[in-house]
Amino acid sequence: MYYKQYGDTDMKVSAVGLGTMRYDEEDVKAGRLEKCAEIPLYAFEKGINYWDTAPAYCHDKSEIITGIALSQVKRSDVYVTSKVNLGTLNEDASRDNFRRRLETSLDRLKTDYIDFYHMWCMLNLESWEKHMELLYGFFEEAKSEGLIRNIVFSSHMQGNDIEKVVETGKFKGMLIGYNALNYQFRQSGIRKAYENGMGVVVMNP
């Protein structure tokens, strides 16, 4: 496996990561989560050390499955992500609700910290500005306590809007949809992130 430095951090992540949005539908519905956890463990055997998960993925079971797998490897050998936004908080942007959401993710993942915690699914600048106003301070607090190691964001915005987010210097990295069909709408944002020493992870390749 080829490993790359994540932005200006000291973290070396696998060039191919593991997305955990979908597992076998029948296994999930039947509660065969240990069987599902064989997938991230197999990925780990092949050198994949970046596991991406989130609340609500896979009928709200993805973090649990990831935690089952994570408990069977050395924690420092894997970089784990999760995510939060106003939707997962049911539009309740209180500190207590944010903390409950984060602690639920930590409990499910069977870990005491998350390597990359995403401000999740920023669709446009208006959405991003609202999340920055209401939630960013909670991210900073959690980071200062060691509950999360890096504040990052995921987005489906176009490149010029991504550039504006990057230029704030508030994030260590981003998760962005990027492929042969949409590259022209995202390229400038990715270039700006690289110039600013941010890590870039691609989804929907």
Identify what each model region corresponds to:
Residues M1-V78:
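N-terminal binding-site loop/beta-alpha segment at the start of enzyme catalytic domains
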Residues Q5, V13-G17, N49-Y50, D77-K83, ...:
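Structural preference for beta-strand elements that scaffold enzyme active sites
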Residues G7-K12, E45, G67-D77, E103-D112, ...:
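Acidic (Asp/Glu)-rich catalytic clusters
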Residues D27-A30, A54-E63, G87-D96, L125-W128, ...:
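Acidic-and-aromatic substrate-binding clefts and catalytic sites of carbohydrate-active enzymes
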Residues V28-F44, E91-K110, H156-V166:
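Short, acidic/polar
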Residues E63-K83, E133-G146, V201-V202:
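Alpha-helix-loop-beta-strand connector modules within alpha/beta enzyme cores
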Residues L106-E126:
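Active-site groove signature of glycoside hydrolases
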Residues M122-P205:
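Beta/alpha (TIM)-barrel catalytic core signal, keyed to glycine-rich beta->alpha loops juxtaposed to Asp/Glu
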